[in-house]
Amino acid sequence: MTLNLCVLTPNRIVWDSEVKEIILPTNSGQIGVLPNHAPIATAVDIGILRIRLNGQWLTMALMGGFAKIGSNEIIVLVNDAEKGSDIDPQEAQQTLEIAEANLKKAEGKRQTIEANLALRRARTRVEAINAV
């Protein structure tokens, strides 16, 4: 039995096909979803979506949003998403270093919050490349 997974951003469909299992980053922790999962709606955190397909695990960097799970269908609406295989490792590492430097230079509460979010997004992209 499989699940139909659809990952959408405001600009495109990132994923729309059947999968065996997913591990979804939510604001209250990661949740595993198998076929016949109980219906839920949940906030999606910045983090790694893990997708099991044909005995392999694939990764996707998610940048926060919402997910609806029900009747073997998962719809994930996020601000942005990238498949781990589509992320350029050098560019992601460079972005991470810039985000770390910007956090050190941040002055005031607003800049610190924005720099922390940018750092979380950059770390997630790097982790999506290296995750299994």
From Swiss-Prot:
Record localization: Plastid, Chloroplast thylakoid membrane
GO molecular function, one term: ATP binding
Stored CDD domains: F1-ATPase_delta
Principal subcellular localisation of the protein: plastid
Signal peptide feature range: none
Pfam families per UniProt: ATP-synt_DE, ATP-synt_DE_N
Membrane topology: Peripheral membrane protein
Keywords: ATP synthesis, CF(1), Chloroplast, Hydrogen ion transport, Ion transport, Membrane, Plastid, Thylakoid, Transport
Role, per record: Produces ATP from ADP in the presence of a proton gradient across the membrane.
Protein name (Swiss-Prot/TrEMBL): ATP synthase epsilon chain, chloroplastic
Taxonomic source organism: Coffea arabica
